[in-house]
C-alpha cells in the first residue's frame, strides 16, 4: 500500500513537472525522439525566424538554410569563456557527426555586442572555429533588441575595471531548428559535444 502511494505521488510529480514545462514538453516525454537537450517543439514563446546581416552585409533568414539543422547561438567575440567553449564544442560535434552530416548543419553566431564586433572582427572570429560557421551582426540597436526579445535572450553591458572597458552578461544557450525550419531545442552551455551529436543525429534522420 505504501509503495502504491509513493508510486502515485511520483507519477503525479512527473506529470506536474511536464505540465509546468508546457504541453509540448509533455509530448516530448512520451514520444520519440528522445532528445538529451530541452525539447521546445511547438513553444510559441520563442521566435520562429530572423533577418540579420552577415559579415558581408547580406541579410540572412532561416529560409536561406532550408534542409539544414540550424544552431543559433548568441554571444560576443570578447567573451572569455562560454562563447569560445560553445563554438569549440559545436566544431567538435560536427567532426564527430562526419562530413556528410556536418554539411547539413549550419551554426550561426549572433553577436550581442555589435558595438565592438565589427563585420571584420566577427568575420575572423566565427569561421576560426569552423569555416562553415556564419556570424550575424544586428545592424542597429533596434534590430538587436528585436531578435533578443523574439528569442527571449538576456544581455547587458557590465562595466569593467579599466575606464571604458566592459563585458557582456548574456543568456548562455543555443536554439536549434530542424531541417524543416521548426524550432526544436534549447541547449544550455557546457554540456560537451556528446549531447549535440546525439540530438543533431535525431534531427537529421
Tell me what each language-model feature is.
Residues 2-18:
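Bacterial N-terminal signal peptides that target proteins for export
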Residues 25-28:
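C-terminal motif of bacterial Sec signal peptides marking the signal peptidase cleavage site
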Residues 30-32:
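Bacterial signal peptide processing site
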Residues 50-70:
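A short beta-strand-turn-helix
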Residues 63-86, 90:
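Short active-site neighborhood of thiol/selenol oxidoreductases, capturing the structured segment around
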Residues 103-117, 133-142:
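Thiol-based oxidoreductase modules, predominantly thioredoxin-like and allied folds used
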Residues 123-171:
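Short, internal strand/loop/helix patches
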Residues 149, 159-205:
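Thiol-/selenol-based redox modules, centered on thioredoxin-like
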Amino acid at each position: 500500500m505504501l509503495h502504491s502511494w509513493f508510486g502515485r505521488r511520483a507519477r503525479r510529480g512527473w506529470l506536474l513537472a511536464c505540465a509546468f514545462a508546457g504541453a509540448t514538453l509533455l509530448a516530448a516525454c512520451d514520444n520519440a525522439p528522445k532528445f538529451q537537450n530541452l525539447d521546445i517543439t511547438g513553444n510559441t514563446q520563442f521566435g520562429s525566424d530572423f533577418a540579420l546581416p552577415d559579415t558581408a552585409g547580406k541579410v540572412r533568414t532561416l529560409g536561406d538554410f532550408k534542409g539544414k539543422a540550424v544552431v543559433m547561438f548568441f554571444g560576443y567575440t570578447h567573451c572569455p569563456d562560454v562563447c569560445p567553449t560553445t563554438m569549440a564544442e559545436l566544431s567538435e560535434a560536427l567532426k564527430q557527426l562526419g562530413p556528410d552530416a556536418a554539411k547539413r548543419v549550419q551554426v550561426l553566431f549572433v553577436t550581442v555586442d555589435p558595438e565592438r564586433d565589427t563585420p571584420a572582427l566577427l568575420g575572423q572570429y566565427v569561421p576560426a572555429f569552423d569555416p562553415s560557421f556564419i556570424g550575424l551582426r544586428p545592424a542597429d540597436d533596434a534590430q538587436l533588441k528585436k531578435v533578443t526579445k523574439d528569442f527571449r535572450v538576456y544581455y547587458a553591458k557590465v562595466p569593467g575595471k579599466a575606464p571604458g572597458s566592459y563585458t557582456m552578461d548574456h543568456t548562455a544557450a543555443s536554439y536549434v531548428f530542424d531541417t524543416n525550419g521548426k524550432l526544436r531545442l534549447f541547449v544550455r552551455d557546457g554540456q560537451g559535444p556528446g549531447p549535440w551529436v546525439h540530438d543533431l543525429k535525431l534531427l537529421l534522420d
